[in-house]
Design a protein with these regions (language model features):
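Cleft-lining beta-strand/loop regions that shape enzyme active-site pockets
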Residues: 58-60, 65-190, 313-437, 476
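Short acidic-hydrophobic, aromatic-tinged amphipathic segments that line or gate anion-handling sites
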Residues: 171-172, 275-281, 415-416, 517-523
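Alpha-helical coiled-coil heptad-repeat segments
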Residues: 463, 468-469, 473-490
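Amphipathic alpha-helical substructures
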Residues: 251-272, 277, 491-521
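Short beta-alpha connecting loops at secondary-structure transitions
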Residues: 418-426, 455-472
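Conserved phosphate-handling catalytic cores of large alpha/beta enzymes
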Residues: 413, 432-446, 450, 459-460
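Generic long, charged, amphipathic alpha-helical segments
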Residues: 376-382, 389, 484-489, 496-503
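Intrinsically disordered, low-complexity segments enriched in small/flexible residues
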Residues: 1-87, 91-94, 100-102, 184-266, ...
Length: 630
């Protein structure tokens, strides 16, 4: 609820409102426990006994610690929904690595005198190129603090090696090998296979490089497709070579030769200079004698121990809003925001940032390959309205292509990772034709309509030239609109945009050369730019503000478990859980709602009762209250 609206309410109305939210929250809690109670019992039984996890860490300036970061699993840049995180932790299957958590912990560790060094172990690490680039940048920044950084490669793929090479010492598992071909695109084509099944695809497009449906029509990539993939591959390879060469202290020609050869045994990798040692942990490298006496602390335990922030947060000047748009763009209701990007779902966040006086600038994090043209245009309009009133900086993740780029262009500044896939300024449509399918399998299609486009609408028919002309005109109109809006946002003539467009995809580095983005960098760089545009001191920390969600009607809290979770997150939990926490804490009261919940949950954990809850609830409830180093 908008803070100004709260102030305008009379006292009785405010009391009634708080009682309503309280009751609604309890409905959500009760409904959630009833629905998930049996699941919780089974899950806890299957997890087995044992001690609750400990987050206490014992080290000091006199006896500094070695931090260990295990990089096994999926890198995720957006924190998962409350229900997803709860269920994954409940069943012990939460292998996701959250980049914001890693960034915060490494930043603090770099300035913490109690931390002597960092060891990372890289196994089955997966993620987009942009996420891996962001992770590597964090490690480079930690190394630049002057503290030793050791990396142990359990599995040696090219992008795992890319991350590991940020370390000053790289150790390779003796049973492993390095397989590093570098950027590789595998293009699979189904044209002939579909024709054998009696299926033909008619593609209508604006932009000769717009090749999304080419695989369903042809048996091999077109020259235009090969051209854009070759240039993008070379751009990504050049970045990979430059980054590894700088960290390993080698010339670019040597590193490029490594990737061309592609395959090394552990001993060959050591002899060629790709790694420094062969072994199972950091002790295989030249550690000082004092390292053996240093306590070994997991990075997640260090983060949970409440490591001190080195700089104060400026709380009285407002803050910067972070809005995340991740996934495909499609039409849908606001409740489908967890399943991609919808105009209604994102509009709530954009309008909140536009009207909330505490928000002085906005970082819009976009990671989207595109989607619906209509949905993209609706979001573009909302971003435009926001940018007309407050500075907006777009931070591009893995993708900001097609519709993902469309919704980016109203922002005052666009920042991409070198490995971001962007551009794809074009429009494409597909019409399946099943006439041969009808002849082959005896399946017929009949359509009853007064429309003159009957053959076009019938999957078993063939559209006329007039049909195709009409469809092409709609495609061309959308493309023309796309060009005009890019030209408006990037402040360049439409003809120049058209020359860069044509549906062609680019790496972030290519996009910078073409002036489709303003700078190369990650999310921290976007926050720095936002601070500049907001008139903040870039060397100080300011609160990062998050949209807390709209309130739910009472009956909405009684829906599916997922809906109950959303109800808890969007207001119900903030009111209902504190009194519940106080009650469960055997009457212990607290003036701080977050503190009350934390103390109660700590007792549960110490009793070994519910070890999955601290990370689940504290991350979600504390999130709107917390400030980070942006």
């Amino acid at each position: 609820v908008n803070e100004n609206a709260q102030q305008r309410r009379s006292l009785p109305l405010r009391i009634i409102h708080r009682l309503y939210v309280l009751v609604r929250g309890y409905f959500a809690v009760v409904g959630l426990l009833v629905t998930l109670g049996p699941v919780l019992i089974v899950a806890l039984a299957t997890r087995g006994g044992g001690e609750a996890p400990k987050t206490k860490v014992d080290f000091s300036v006199e006896q500094p610690a070695r931090l260990k970061l295990g990089l096994h699993g999926l890198l995720v840049e957006k924190e998962p929904g409350i229900s997803d995180r709860f269920l994954s932790q409940l069943f012990g299957d939460d292998r996701s690595l959250y980049l914001p958590d890693i960034r915060s912990a490494l930043r603090r560790a770099a300035a913490d005198e109690r931390v002597a060094r960092l060891e990372i172990e890289i196994g089955s690490l997966t993620g987009s190129l942009a996420e891996l680039t962001e992770l590597r940048r964090m490690l480079v920044e930690f190394r630049e603090s002057g503290k030793p950084l050791h990396a142990v490669l359990v599995e040696g793929s090219d992008w795992n090696y890319y991350v590991a090479s940020a370390a000053g010492h790289v150790i390779l598992n003796p049973a492993s090998s390095l397989i590093i071909p570098g950027p590789t695109f595998t293009l699979t084509y189904f044209g002939e296979a579909l024709r054998k099944l009696g299926v033909e695809i008619e593609v209508l497009r604006a932009g000769k490089y717009k090749s999304a449906f080419e695989a369903f029509v042809q048996n091999a990539p077109s020259e235009a497709t090969l051209e854009q993939y070759r240039t993008m591959e070379e751009s990504l390879r050049a970045h990979l070579v430059e980054a590894v060469a700088a960290s390993r202290g080698k010339d670019a020609a040597t590193v490029r030769g490594w990737f061309k050869r592609s395959i090394f045994t552990a001993e060959q990798a050591r002899a060629s200079g790709l790694v420094d040692a062969i072994g199972y942990d950091a002790e295989a490298s030249d550690l000082p004698a004092t390292a053996a006496r240093e306590p070994l602390v997991k990075l997640e335990d260090y983060a949970a121990s409440g490591a001190p922030e080195t700089r104060p947060v400026v709380e009285d000047q407002g803050g910067i809003a972070l809005i995340e748009a991740v996934g495909e763009i499609h039409m849908g209701d606001a409740g489908m925001a967890d399943e991609g990007i919808t105009p209604l779902g994102l509009r709530r966040e954009l309008r909140w940032a536009q009207t909330d006086d505490k928000v002085k600038a906005v970082v819009l994090r976009i990671s989207s390959p595109g989607g619906s043209a209509v949905a993209s245009d609706m979001i573009w309009n909302d971003v435009r309205k926001l940018a007309a009133e407050k500075p907006v900086v777009v931070s591009m993740g893995a993708y900001a292509a097609s519709g993902g780029y469309y919704i980016s262009v109203p922002a005052q500044r666009l920042i991409a990772e070198p490995t971001t896939i962007t551009g794809s300024i074009g429009v494409i449509g597909m019409l399946p034709r099943l006439g041969a399918f009808e002849e082959k399998y005896g399946v017929s299609f009949h359509i009853v309509t007064q429309s003159e486009r009957a053959n076009l609408l019938n999957p078993g028919g063939k559209g006329s030239d007039e049909d195709r002309a009409l469809m092409t005109s709609t495609i061309d109109q959308v493309y023309s609109t796309f060009l005009e809006k890019v030209a408006l946002g990037r402040k360049m003539p439409v003809s120049e945009v058209d020359a860069r467009a044509q549906g062609r995809v680019y790496s972030g580095l290519q996009a910078l050369d073409l002036k489709l983005v303003d700078a190369i960098g990650g999310l921290p760089d976007a926050f720095k730019a936002a601070k500049e545009l907001a008139g903040f001191d870039v060397d100080k920390l300011y609160p990062v503000l998050h949209y807390e969600g709209d309130e739910f009607a009472l009956h909405e809290c009684l829906g599916s478990p997922q809906q109950m979770m959303r109800c808890l997150r969007r207001g119900g939990a903030r009111v209902a859980l504190p009194p519940l926490a106080v009650g469960l804490a055997w009457g212990q009261a607290s003036t701080s709602r977050a503190e009350a919940i934390a103390k109660t949950l700590e007792r549960w954990v110490d009793a070994g009762a519910l070890a999955v809850w601290p990370g689940y609830l504290s991350a979600e409830i504390d999130r709107p209250m917390s400030s980070t180093s942006r």
